[in-house]
């Protein structure tokens, strides 16, 4: 809404995430986004919505760029990795506020190479790194995850010893009311096709 909230918008230079945001901005419920995006009409609808702000978009490619764009005043709002905004807001008192409504959650994964000589050691590491306490401890440094529900009660304070991390977690129930989890299967099947169209659209 450029009229209600004037100013430039920062968006990642990629189809993934932006098409989902566009459909939600156009009134599609979070739970229906991928069902709609799986149709030609849905894709067209997403691009049509993006077109309404295209002239006001500043495209970013690296995760470090959104906080820089905000701090410099080049954009009024931007999509971003939440951890990239949290740290400068807390440690440098930057006036950044995260809008959780419509957030998209993306998961990272561990993989073990088939045939590795260290299979047992690798399995031990994956088991440890995805267990309850280590995932909660990770949140001491950056507010990502934890992906395991059992970790939530153990999330403590930021490394400054003062800032409670729980309210800053994407997985905090208060932050998940209108969230969607990125559909990795959808993007595995459609990424090349949709991103090619996206790149061509940017260049028009």
Task: Show where each model-derived region lies.
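Extracytoplasmic ligand-binding site segments that recognize negatively charged/polar headgroups
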Residues: 1-65, 71
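A ligand-binding cleft/hinge motif common to bilobed small-molecule-binding domains
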Residues: 77-94
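Solvent-exposed loop/turn segments at secondary-structure junctions
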Residues: 15-19, 83-87, 103-105, 117, ...
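Mature extracytoplasmic/periplasmic domains
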Residues: 113-178
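Conserved C-terminal helix/tail region of periplasmic/extracytoplasmic solute-binding proteins
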Residues: 68, 174-204
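Periplasmic-binding protein-like
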Residues: 43-44, 48-52, 91-116, 158-161
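Sec-exported extracytoplasmic/periplasmic mature domains
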Residues: 2-5, 23-28, 51-55, 71, ...
